[in-house]
Amino acid sequence: MKPRYLYPKDYYADPSANVFNGKLFVYPSHDWEAGAAFDDDGGHFQMKDYHVISMEDVEEGEVTDHGMILHVDQVKWAEKQMWDNDVVEKDGKYYLIFSAKDYNGVFHLGVAVADRPEGPFVPEEQPIRSSCSIDPCAFKDDDGQIYVYFGGLWGGQLQWYRPIKHIHTAAPKQAVNRISPTASVDLGPAPDRKTQLFGYPDAPALPSFVVRMSDDVKQFSEAPREVVVIDKDGQPLKAGDPHRFFEASWMHKYNGKYYFSYSTGDSHMLCYAIGDNPYGPFTYQGVILDPVVGWTTHHSIVEYKGQWYLFYHDCVPSNDITHLRSLKVQQLFYNEDGTIRKVVNE
């Protein structure tokens, strides 16, 4: 199939595709023109609600927009910027896990619950305890355990939640912590952890987080762990590597292996790594998608009716307005050794 724009009537982005009850549902961000100035922290992305679309034929069938399923005004703790989200099912309930900024300008993850995948979703009154940053991906493993992968740099604030250690003779002797006092979260002790100092490309790249969810899918059941992407020699990718993690975590499983895929941010690629369990480490494999039109790239990978698909977005319909993005889909294929064939955007 040729790449297909799924819903050209509106600007949707950051697609999280899931199969529920034999139908494919996509939970996107909802772009609009807020008039906010462009900045490196994503202030021009002022999304304020979520919709869900569904289809029974990905390649040619009708796409239904089920309307708004959650608005920022319904979320007591959130002020603005309803960024990426994902939905997972457990025991007949559907859990929307989303990212938004609170009234201190700090991103957290929240949960909203529905009886149907079409919503509407009712939000919890408080964000997930100890949550931070953006871009949650909710992954349900074969044993029923649910894991959430999350994190994004720059405007996604992931860099706030690492003690920045001295890693260079020119760096200060005492660690510098960029965390705001209003944003304090407990991600567990890490006294010897070295992380990325901006401008130090030989430091280990900042990883995303993964955490197993509680039985009610409303809280973390443990301290989040780092999702480490390593090279073929077993070494973590460096901050200066254009293939290192930046944002947009996604997890899927193929032939018993765990595929962690992500956006590289300022190098604008989708890349992936493979591991043997949900926590990793994950060994870097390659590029899934080269840069598209627009600054961000964000995706999901899902099997539906025997065919694998890559869902993503670009800014071609809006003439390269980076905060007005459009959903896109095309087929995805594996090689015999389990590696993913690079997808060519058209």
PLM ranges: what are they?
Residues M1-E346:
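Carbohydrate-active catalytic/glycan-binding domains of CAZyme proteins
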